[in-house]
């Protein structure tokens, strides 16, 4: 290990000389306390080091020791239910080692527990030919997650020895005989965070990641293996939307990265997730979640690492064949960390002071999402769905981070502060949002939910767009200028907005809606429109139709019908048809 000497300190950036044997992205121990840093630039024998801890008290002349290894994460049993900081230090073990509730500098703790023993059940046997990515056994980490122990990348050969039993993450579970000699395999493996884990092939994502949020699943779906952005001004509900997706999304593993946001938001996750029950497994949501907390009061430089740490952990579970979702809240704070380091490196600034390479760094992150055929001989399919919040100052999405993100992702959930002020949640604006997966997912929905799903979705979306145009006419000349058919359209649009798109995240039934229930709800609202138009054509006055308040109230309350009682909606359809038939038979005398 080569020792250099500090010649300059500028906030989280340290410049050291005598580092000619070091490589870019090597991890260094900086100063007498051995603070963790990473080389981000080399000029001759001078290395610019990004330090992931507070640098006060460090000065020129202090030593810098390079470890010769890139910043890597430990991957193995013990990840699920854990909470790490941006460079994968477990916060509970860190607190015990530091004997403090706050981050103390220079404390070194292993990422995975070295004492805990895990029950390993081999699925391979002595004499089997194995290569990178092959599963050789399993560890039941939580009641929900089974870790599939894989041959590390770069090892290929014949199993010489494999043992069942209880092991710590560093004990040898198998020995593989390779051309270059015997290689030991442990439960744990390391991987550099800035390098994507390899796979056999990338697959086109066609299956939706269901979230139980009606506005997302129906109008702006994201595919398993897709990428989505949630931009919005402060208070519009970015974090709440991400929490809802983390809670109810049908991913098997959730990696939640709190990057530069308030600590209270991570506290909410830690408090809520253990108490919430996953509808699919009946277990606590925490049993499938990995948390990475790099809040706004933690060192800025570690924000940059936290997103890479999160995506590398997600890739590890993807390689086991799991559907993983990663939430990054917020990529804007990560970009601000890039901007700060770029400024300290005295690089030429790009738009609004962000570095010129902002777009490519964002692309590097989002491109690690996707649906893939994993390495190994069993043809496992895994996916990572990346959902990134963007916090543009003042809600202005013309700023560089939002624009760079929108060029990369295929789903845009635009949050609207106006909807938040109206207490309409989720605050996804149906006129500005889009999903480029919608047509592909419509085919899946038509085959798996109902044949006319795509047609219903298109009809509802058209009504909402027509409503925006009709509202302008109403504001100019009043509602009396509209025909009865247009006034009916406004009434149906209001029903779609308030009874379908609006969803109460704190109501035990309304917080999650299955696809079957979504289909029945949308069919009910659009069925009301069809029946009302039939009555108008038969000469019934619109006021008589709008006066059916009891039925309209039942349609509005259909969102609170339990998933086990969906036949009640069929009864509403029958009652609606009978009520319209009665109006037509009576001749519809208006109350005008």
From Swiss-Prot:
Give the intrachain disulfide bonds: none
The EC number(s) this enzyme carries: 7.1.2.2
Q: What keywords were assigned to this record?
A: ATP synthesis, ATP-binding, Hydrogen ion transport, Ion transport, Nucleotide-binding, Translocase, Transport
InterPro entries the record matches: ATP-synt_VA_C (IPR055190), ATP-synth_a_Xtn (IPR031686), ATP_synth_asu-like_sf (IPR023366), ATPase_F1/V1/A1_a/bsu_N (IPR004100), ATPase_F1/V1/A1_a/bsu_N_sf (IPR036121), ATPase_F1/V1/A1_a/bsu_nucl-bd (IPR000194), ATPase_F1/V1_b/a_C (IPR024034), P-loop_NTPase (IPR027417)
Q: Sorted alphabetically, which SUPFAM superfamilies does this protein's record hold? A: C-terminal domain of alpha and beta subunits of F1 ATP synthase, N-terminal domain of alpha and beta subunits of F1 ATP synthase, P-loop containing nucleoside triphosphate hydrolases
Which Gene3D superfamilies does its entry note? 2.40.30.20, 2.40.50.100, Bovine Mitochondrial F1-atpase, Atp Synthase Beta Chain, Chain D, domain 3 (1.10.1140.10), P-loop containing nucleotide triphosphate hydrolases (3.40.50.300)
Which positions are annotated as binding ATP? 232-239
* This protein's GO CC annotations: proton-transporting ATP synthase complex
Q: Which reaction does it catalyse?
A: ATP + H2O + 4 H(+)(in) = ADP + phosphate + 5 H(+)(out)
Q: Name one GO molecular function term.
A: proton-transporting ATPase activity, rotational mechanism
Q: What class of enzyme is it?
A: translocase
- What Pfam families does its record include? ATP-synt_ab, ATP-synt_ab_N, ATP-synt_ab_Xtn, ATP-synt_VA_C
Record GO biological process: proton motive force-driven plasma membrane ATP synthesis
State what this protein does: Produces ATP from ADP in the presence of a proton gradient across the membrane. The V-type alpha chain is a catalytic subunit.
Q: Which family does it belong to?
A: Belongs to the ATPase alpha/beta chains family.
Q: What is this protein called?
A: V-type ATP synthase alpha chain
What taxonomic lineage is listed for the species of origin? Bacteria, Bacillati, Bacillota, Clostridia, Eubacteriales
